[in-house]
């Protein structure tokens, strides 16, 4: 899959989760932060990244950089996705179902952030496994990566699109 050049896209960033971690040293605790970020153009391109630093703004900046490096193309069918899909990452499991126009994005926290920035307007989702933000984000990205348009499936099977849909 060709890499997506994020610099050519009008992207929007969203903070999904900021975590403070402590390293215990002889003189006390050393705090650092990790920021889970999602970047998207609202038109089928989305990416997620994790940034770690001693300060929150720096962690966010690094997270955005990482997210832009890991962007994927999401095949959209109008305002929804082409078919139902389950994405898994670690113990995180996310079910994505296409929905009729006007339904809206029915999703919780981390999954909602990704879908909105990807440009999906109508979708039903359900978190089936761990609710850890990092695993949910990565599971959603895996699910979106595995989506295929009817044209792609027809080409892979060597059949006309009408035969698949009809």
Curated annotation (Swiss-Prot):
<comment type="similarity">
    <text>Belongs to the universal ribosomal protein uS5 family.</text>
</comment>
<protein>
    <recommendedName>
        <fullName>Small ribosomal subunit protein uS5</fullName>
    </recommendedName>
</protein>
<dbReference type="InterPro" id="IPR000851">
    <property type="entry name" value="Ribosomal_uS5"/>
</dbReference>
<comment type="subunit">
    <text>Part of the 30S ribosomal subunit. Contacts proteins S4 and S8.</text>
</comment>
<dbReference type="GO" id="GO:0015935">
    <property type="term" value="C:small ribosomal subunit"/>
</dbReference>
<feature type="domain" description="S5 DRBM">
    <location>
        <begin position="11"/>
        <end position="74"/>
    </location>
</feature>
<keyword id="KW-0699">rRNA-binding</keyword>
<dbReference type="InterPro" id="IPR020568">
    <property type="entry name" value="Ribosomal_Su5_D2-typ_SF"/>
</dbReference>
<comment type="function">
    <text>Located at the back of the 30S subunit body where it stabilizes the conformation of the head with respect to the body.</text>
</comment>
<keyword id="KW-0689">Ribosomal protein</keyword>
<dbReference type="InterPro" id="IPR005324">
    <property type="entry name" value="Ribosomal_uS5_C"/>
</dbReference>
<dbReference type="GO" id="GO:0003735">
    <property type="term" value="F:structural constituent of ribosome"/>
</dbReference>
<keyword id="KW-0687">Ribonucleoprotein</keyword>
<dbReference type="GO" id="GO:0006412">
    <property type="term" value="P:translation"/>
</dbReference>
<dbReference type="Pfam" id="PF03719">
    <property type="entry name" value="Ribosomal_S5_C"/>
</dbReference>
<dbReference type="InterPro" id="IPR005712">
    <property type="entry name" value="Ribosomal_uS5_bac-type"/>
</dbReference>
<dbReference type="InterPro" id="IPR014721">
    <property type="entry name" value="Ribsml_uS5_D2-typ_fold_subgr"/>
</dbReference>
<dbReference type="InterPro" id="IPR013810">
    <property type="entry name" value="Ribosomal_uS5_N"/>
</dbReference>
<dbReference type="GO" id="GO:0019843">
    <property type="term" value="F:rRNA binding"/>
</dbReference>
<comment type="function">
    <text>With S4 and S12 plays an important role in translational accuracy.</text>
</comment>
<dbReference type="InterPro" id="IPR018192">
    <property type="entry name" value="Ribosomal_uS5_N_CS"/>
</dbReference>
<keyword id="KW-0694">RNA-binding</keyword>
<dbReference type="Pfam" id="PF00333">
    <property type="entry name" value="Ribosomal_S5"/>
</dbReference>
